[in-house]
Amino acid sequence: TWLMKEFGKTYYEKTAYISFYNNQRMQAVFDTDFDIKRIIMNLNIESGVAITPENTLIVLDEIQNAPKALESLKYFCEEAPEYHVIAAGSLLGVALHEGISYPVGKVDLLDLYPFNFREFLCAMDEEGLESALETKDYNLIDNFADKYLFWLKNYYYTGGMPAVVDAFRLNKDYAEVRQIQSDIVRQYEGDFGKHIEAKVLPRIRMVWDSIPRQLAKENKKFFFGQIKKGARSSEFEIAIQWLLDCGL
């Protein structure tokens, strides 16, 4: 959400932001038909922004809650390419797995991931170290092995979630890092119940809770016995697939 808004602020005169989360009115707008002129009029009113071609970025957030809005991207592309639209969905992988129509060939798809190590170095204002990795000059890299090890250990501790990296960049406070990480994990867990059937929820939580135990083993093979004694794959395949579709 922040990234889309920042992109709009940087490259467009105006940004019209629409979220479909708990927004039945806007979901209904797209359920009616794919008349782009009518849709734009509704987006104007909802966002409070006068949408004009070329210089307004239309942001459709939590689009997995409005399947027809996702499908409408095909018609924006074919019938009204002068309107610039960007969309995001936190559980879009789950939505697509459940059969929501996807506008194949009409959109550019971008998956977002946590920072990798090189991006982490740049965030820590260590562009020199990052550039040296690009050269693959291992004599040069070896000269600064102590610096790479220092930052690699910090990267392993902080991970790559942007809020965590930003806090560490500003304060270098390991306790603050751990608190933010814990908050993110709790937010994930709190989100589970909003998007899945109640009967599947306990199994998803059990798989999720078993992940640290799975990773702590020397043998990295996934053992269902780490979830619960006597567990079988058939009991948890839906839960595992759901977490995979979420990108978790």
Residue ranges of model-derived segments:
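Short glycine-rich substrate-engagement loop in P-loop NTPases that contacts/grips substrate
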Residues: 22-56
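Conserved catalytic/switch belt of AAA+ P-loop NTPases
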Residues: 70-87, 91-93
